[in-house]
């Protein structure tokens, strides 16, 4: 057995590089973060062959003095902190002083830099484990340029594990998207094999930032995102949250703490819990930025700084949850029609009773026409059109931003309606006609008392296979069929939970890698797990799923069950939350509108009214009066 000895610096740096330099994207991350710490307002990234051949980062930051260039390539050398107290309040990206030394130990690295008070630039070169640094004069403006050539040239085993050039560049591009969202003030460019792939111009106002959000997250997310602005004591949460009505499935899940992108189960749980009673989204998208006193968060808990530890984690969780719930509740108060097929009510006009789209004719369920559906109004139709970016349009309670999206913010106007002046108009009805039109609604085809929807009546007409068209004495509204299906299924499951669900054995048990503390979770919540009809065991670090309730049998159990176990770490869910969780996963396929209406009819009156309150109001009278007065 060999005796204990101190490792030589070259070997120590290569071992450290195993944690710091995982792939080319890791190099880009460390070097760009150094540029941001240096106060750069522009960062240009040049990549060749996915980063295996060349990674070049150029910035206009403060630069590095000549006498510190060689020191910058030494291990544990940093300008970010000097005392133990500094480590307790870190605001910079870097602080360990490992990146440049680790990168230079597995590549050929050249660092060229100039400060504002120097008349000339200087260049330092280091190659592999040799650790010898050569410094020579060079030509360069104020700022720094770092070239990393032949990454892993001296560690062939590491080089063999690199993926294709396209895959490695995709990782670089994805990381740049993340940093571009939190540092909107920085101009980023990304070039691959001589071709400019990304050009994120500085975002100096909200409209420009929304343009960047569109570039990174896509127009569908940006158009319907809810803006978040919330502050309490030393906590401030800002950013954008996916609209609960958005049908878009997005991979935008970015959370930042003091400008640093992190992954945190606490945050994911808060977001899912906020959406739990608001939408059927499996993974709602978000770009959230939390500013917190640096003394209240420890960023030195992960080798790649991907995780942090909050000193008051429960307080932070509840703060985020409450802020998101407030935003969702306020958005719900806006009478907004959020749908891929009903984003914009383009025109309201008098049409013939045989109109194929609208209120004038009976609606269809699938291919079958509902013979029993009575016309609500004999001569009116609503034409529906998807909202397009950069196009003038009408919207309920939305605020059109500078780049043509329809992001709903917390200070959006409520219940307002605006129409494009450039739209072609048909002849509008007179005020007398409007009054007559209102009188028709005063005597609907079936009686409605106290604005309550009577389930004993025939099923209402269906619009776009998604909504029931509901009428009261003087109102028209759209009731989402999927929301009713979810609510009725919740009621059914919650009633059965009192006596316990009967689990169904799986033909082939599902096995998932188990976290270290899952056994403790299973032991603590054994009664609850049995009540749900679940049979879960852990053997050889594997979670084995043997029985599940019928409501989630068709779900992706390898994903659904682990996520639920993670949530149990934070709290024991109430029966209503359990019912919602099961119901959400049971409605992934086709649902029958008549069956849903029949189930809705069996609910107690107060339950029916709560569901009916989810209907989206169509303020047709105010709009018609507004048009007639012009």
Curated annotation (Swiss-Prot):
Membrane-traversing stretches: none
SMART domains, sorted: DNA_mis_repair, MutL_C
Matching PROSITE patterns: DNA_MISMATCH_REPAIR_1
Annotated HAMAP family: DNA_mis_repair
Keyword Disulfide bond: no
GO molecular function annotations of the record: ATP binding; ATP hydrolysis activity; ATP-dependent DNA damage sensor activity; mismatched DNA binding
Domain of life the protein comes from: Bacteria
Functional note: This protein is involved in the repair of mismatches in DNA. It is required for dam-dependent methyl-directed DNA mismatch repair. May act as a 'molecular matchmaker', a protein that promotes the formation of a stable complex between two or more DNA-binding proteins in an ATP-dependent manner without itself being part of a final effector complex.
Classification via InterPro entries: DNA_mismatch_repair_CS (IPR014762), DNA_mismatch_repair_MutL (IPR020667), DNA_mismatch_S5_2-like (IPR013507), HATPase_C_sf (IPR036890), MutL/Mlh/PMS (IPR002099), MutL/Mlh/Pms-like (IPR038973), MutL_C (IPR014790), MutL_C_regsub (IPR042121)
Phylogenetic placement of the source organism: Bacteria, Pseudomonadati, Pseudomonadota, Gammaproteobacteria, Alteromonadales
Family: Belongs to the DNA mismatch repair MutL/HexB family.
Gene Ontology cellular component list: mismatch repair complex
Region (Disordered): 398-425
Annotated GO biological process: mismatch repair
Keyword line: DNA damage, DNA repair
Ranges of compositional bias, category Polar residues: 398-408
Protein known as: DNA mismatch repair protein MutL
């Amino acid at each position: 057995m060999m005796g204990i000895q101190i490792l030589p610096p070259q070997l120590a740096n290569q071992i450290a590089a195993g944690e710091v330099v995982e792939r080319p994207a890791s190099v880009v991350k460390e070097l760009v973060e150094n540029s941001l710490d240096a106060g750069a307002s522009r960062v240009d990234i040049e990549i060749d062959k996915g980063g295996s051949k060349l990674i070049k980062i150029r910035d206009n930051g403060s630069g590095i003095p000549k006498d510190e260039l060689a020191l910058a390539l030494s291990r544990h050398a940093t300008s970010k902190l000097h005392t133990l107290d500094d480590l307790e309040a870190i605001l910079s990206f870097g602080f360990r002083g490992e990146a440049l030394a680790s990168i230079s130990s597995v590549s050929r690295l050249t660092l060229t830099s100039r400060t504002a008070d120097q008349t000339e630039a200087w260049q330092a070169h280091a190659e592999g484990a040799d650790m010898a640094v050569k410094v020579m004069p060079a030509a360069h403006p104020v700022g720094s340029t770092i070239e990393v050539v032949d990454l892993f040239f001296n560690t062939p085993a590491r080089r063999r594990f690199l993926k294709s050039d396209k895959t490695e560049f995709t990782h670089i591009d994805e990381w740049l998207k993340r940093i571009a969202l939190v540092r909107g003030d920085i101009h980023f460019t990304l070039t691959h094999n001589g071709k400019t792939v990304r050009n994120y111009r500085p975002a100096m106002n909200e409209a420009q930032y929304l343009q960047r959000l569109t570039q990174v997250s896509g127009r569908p997310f940006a158009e319907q995102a809810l803006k978040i602005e919330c502050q309490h004591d030393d906590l401030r949460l800002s950013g954008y949250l996916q609209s609960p009505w958005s049908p878009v499935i997005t991979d935008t899940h970015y959370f930042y703490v003091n400008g640093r992108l992190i992954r945190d189960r606490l945050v994911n749980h808060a977001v899912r819990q906020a959406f739990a009673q608001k939408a059927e989204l499996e993974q709602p998208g978000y770009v959230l930025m939390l500013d917190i006193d640096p003394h209240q968060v420890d960023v030195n808990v992960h080798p790649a700084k991907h995780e942090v530890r909050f000193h008051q984690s429960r307080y932070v969780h509840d703060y985020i949850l409450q802020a998101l719930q407030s935003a969702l509740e306020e958005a719900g108060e806006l009478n907004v029609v959020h749908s891929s097929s009903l984003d914009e009510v383009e025109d309201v006009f008098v049409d013939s009773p045989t109109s194929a789209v609208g209120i004038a004719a009976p609606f269809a369920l699938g291919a079958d026409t509902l013979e029993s559906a009575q016309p609500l109004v004999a001569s009116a139709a609503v034409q529906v059109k998807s909202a397009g970016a950069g196009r003038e349009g009408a919207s309920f309670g939305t605020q059109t931003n500078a780049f043509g999206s329809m992001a709903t913010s917390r200070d959006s106007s409520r219940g307002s309606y605006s129409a494009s002046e450039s739209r072609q108009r048909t002849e509008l009805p007179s005020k007398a006609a409007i009054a007559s039109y209102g009188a028709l609604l005063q005597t609907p085809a079936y009686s409605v008392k106290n604005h309550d929807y009577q389930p004993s009546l025939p099923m209402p007409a269906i619009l776009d296979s998604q909504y029931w068209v509901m009428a009261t004495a003087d109102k028209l509204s759209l009731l989402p069929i999927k929301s009713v299906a979810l609510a009725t299924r919740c009621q059914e499951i919650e009633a059965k939970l009192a006596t316990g669900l009967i689990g169904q054995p799986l033909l082939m048990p599902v096995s998932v890698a188990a976290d270290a503390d899952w056994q403790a979770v299973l032991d603590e919540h054994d009664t609850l797990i049995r009540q749900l009809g679940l049979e879960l065991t852990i053997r050889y670090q594997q979670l084995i799923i043997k029985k599940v309730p019928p409501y989630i049998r068709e779900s992706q159990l390898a994903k659904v069950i682990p996520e639920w176990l993670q949530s149990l770490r934070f709290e024991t869910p109430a029966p209503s939350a359990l019912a919602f969780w099961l119901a959400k996963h049971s409605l992934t396929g086709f649902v029958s509108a008549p069956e849903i209406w029949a189930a809705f009819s069996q609910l107690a009156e107060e339950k029916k009214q709560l569901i009916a309150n989810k209907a989206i109001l169509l303020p047709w009278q105010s709009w018609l009066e507004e048009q007639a007065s012009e």
